[in-house]
């Protein structure tokens, strides 16, 4: 096998850290391919690279620096250093791989010159964000393995197509693998993926993108094709980002700005992971932990931006992630999103926020320890959204459990424990069914209502269980209709247990027990309503004194029918209909 490996030292490539090695390296690689070598070995040493050499006049990073031919493996000793010579160009490439196939680059260190760079004025290119460590354009079957890349004025690695998708000469990059690399301190992004099919980034350390004099967007990994309106000129599809460690990247760890079919799995991250305007993104099994000493600016663990122009849905799945220490755990935006089996803790603002979204299912998540000295934390929140389902979630130790402002909602089979205010519907229409609500002597702030419906919101409050409350378990002040059906309220200690004001309401088949230590409690109090129905309820007064089981004297035309009342009375209005009630 040795005869198929060309040692760059034998070819006379300088590695003294004083002599420009670029032209000699290019000659070495070209000779290796022409003579049938499959591998070129670079031994220990410092190789100075003119990353501007040969660059295209319009795209200075193209055909610049070390030009890697196809069907070749470049192997570098761990102490082989490829060091870019300081320059003033707005764009360059240490290694350029263009329209080639079957290439491996492994080992060694590729070091840029961001700290020595001269940031000369360059018009629209004045950001100098196109200085790359490895630039891959329109290639197939490329592997970057165990390479340390740092300190570039643009990106450590960029994977792009050659040409535009609207032209016949468009050539995407496909079957690209970046693994076991360390990519650090790029001014723009550590890795950019702009146009591709089948790219994998795995088991890498991706650190400190955009720090210092960084330039936007400052992402660990940016998956972002160029497009205008609903036309894609570059298309990143089928990308897997898995089992990487992200540390200290300024704006986000991974952002799928507009890619298709993106998997982000099993990563460790201290900053945001975003599905952006992407389509068919799966974010699963990641550990997101915000350090306690991190910057105080609000941060979101997992987020999105919305539906891409020209597309109908986001089709995103956010599943099985562990998120702790962020201001907001998950911020959902777009259409057709599933958020399931995530665990979110130690947040200040919101566990899961659904904002300007539709067709979103939030199912089976555990949200806990939402405590803040400056704001009321919220476990689940929906704002300006429609067709949203909050199902089977467990919310523990939050100030406000569920807060809804607008749209149609289903809130079903959730467990809320240790909260101040449980479920609050401020706008829209909600079905609140099968939930268990237990404030359980919450002490962080004074206890408020377990379920409340206000303003002009409407709700069906059905088959819920209320335990250990010290304030209204059900409070409605809405002008719209509510139906309160089949709920179970245990041992109320309150002077008034259910308070309903204004609107027209149905209060059917609820089971309520009351045990107040002083005074005469009122169990159902209907105030300022006209034409409501109270029927089939079982009210069991365990208090020493007699209770007013149903009070409607400040409402009109109420129908009080078929209720079972133990140790209580009815205080009605003269216009009410009373029939078939059993009072014991």
Swiss-Prot record:
Signal peptide: none annotated. Keywords: Repeat. Pfam families: Beta_helix, Pect-lyase_RHGA_epim. Disulfide bonds: none annotated. It comes from the Bacteria. SUPFAM superfamilies: Pectin lyase-like. This is Uncharacterized protein YclG.
């Amino acid at each position: 096998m040795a005869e198929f490996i060309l040692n760059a030292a034998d070819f006379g490539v300088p590695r003294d850290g004083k002599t420009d090695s670029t032209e000699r390296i290019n000659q070495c690689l070209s000779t290796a391919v022409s003579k049938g070598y499959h591998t070129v070995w670079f031994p220990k040493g410092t190789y100075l690279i003119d990353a501007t050499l040969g660059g295209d006049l319009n795209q200075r990073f193209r055909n610049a620096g070390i030009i890697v031919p196809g069907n070749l493996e470049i192997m570098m000793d761990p102490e082989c250093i490829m060091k870019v010579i300081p320059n003033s160009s707005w764009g360059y490439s240490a290694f350029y791989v263009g329209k080639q196939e079957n290439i491996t680059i492994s080992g060694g260190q590729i070091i840029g010159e961001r700290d020595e760079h001269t940031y000369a004025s360059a018009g629209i290119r004045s950001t100098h964000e196109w200085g790359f460590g490895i630039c891959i354009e329109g290639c197939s079957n490329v592997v970057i393995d165990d390479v340390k890349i740092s300190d570039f004025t643009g990106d450590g690695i960029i994977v792009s197509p050659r040409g535009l998708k609207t032209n016949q000469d468009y050539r995407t990059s496909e079957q690209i693998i970046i693994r076991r690399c360390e990519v650090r301190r790029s001014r723009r992004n550590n890795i950019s993926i702009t146009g591709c099919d089948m790219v994998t980034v795995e088991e890498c350390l991706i650190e400190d993108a955009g720090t210092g004099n960084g330039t936007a967007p400052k992402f660990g990994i940016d998956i972002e094709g160029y497009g205008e309106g609903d036309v894609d000129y570059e298309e990143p599809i089928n990308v897997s980002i898995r089992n990487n460690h992200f540390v200290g990247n300024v704006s986000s760890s991974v952002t799928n700005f507009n890619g298709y079919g993106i998997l982000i799995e099993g990563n460790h991250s201290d900053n945001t992971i975003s599905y952006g305007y992407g389509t068919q993104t799966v974010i699963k099994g990641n550990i997101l932990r915000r350090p306690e000493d991190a910057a105080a600016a609000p941060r979101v663990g997992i987020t999105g931006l919305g539906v891409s122009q020209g597309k109908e849905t986001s089709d995103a799945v956010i599943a099985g992630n562990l998120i702790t220490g962020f201001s907001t755990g998950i911020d959902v935006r777009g259409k057709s999103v599933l958020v399931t089996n995530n665990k979110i803790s130690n947040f200040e603002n919101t566990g899961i926020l659904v904002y300007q979204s539709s067709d979103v299912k939030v199912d089976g998540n555990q949200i806990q320890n939402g405590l803040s000295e400056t704001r009321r934390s919220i476990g689940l929140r929906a704002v300006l959204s429609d067709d949203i389902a909050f199902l089977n979630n467990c919310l523990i130790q939050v100030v406000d459990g569920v807060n809804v402002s607008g749209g149609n909602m289903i809130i079903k089979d959730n467990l809320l424990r240790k909260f101040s205010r449980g479920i609050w519907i401020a706008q829209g229409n909600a079905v609140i069914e099968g939930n268990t609500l237990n404030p359980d002597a919450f002490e962080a702030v004074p206890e408020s209502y377990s379920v409340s419906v206000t303003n002009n919101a409407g709700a069906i409050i059905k088959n819920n269980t209320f335990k250990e409350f010290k304030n209204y378990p059900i409070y409605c002040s809405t002008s719209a209709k509510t139906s309160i059906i089949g709920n179970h309220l245990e041992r109320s200690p309150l002077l008034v247990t259910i308070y309903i004001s204004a609107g027209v309401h149905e209060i059917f088949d609820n089971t309520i027990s009351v045990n107040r230590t002083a005074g005469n409690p009122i169990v159902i109090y209907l105030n300022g309503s006209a034409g409501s129905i109270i029927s089939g309820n079982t009210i069991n007064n365990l208090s020493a004194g007699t209770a007013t089981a149903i009070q409607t004297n400040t409402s009109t035309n109420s129908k009080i029918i078929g209720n079972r009342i133990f140790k209580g009375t009815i205080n009605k209005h003269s216009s009410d209909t009373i029939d078939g009630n059993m009072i014991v």
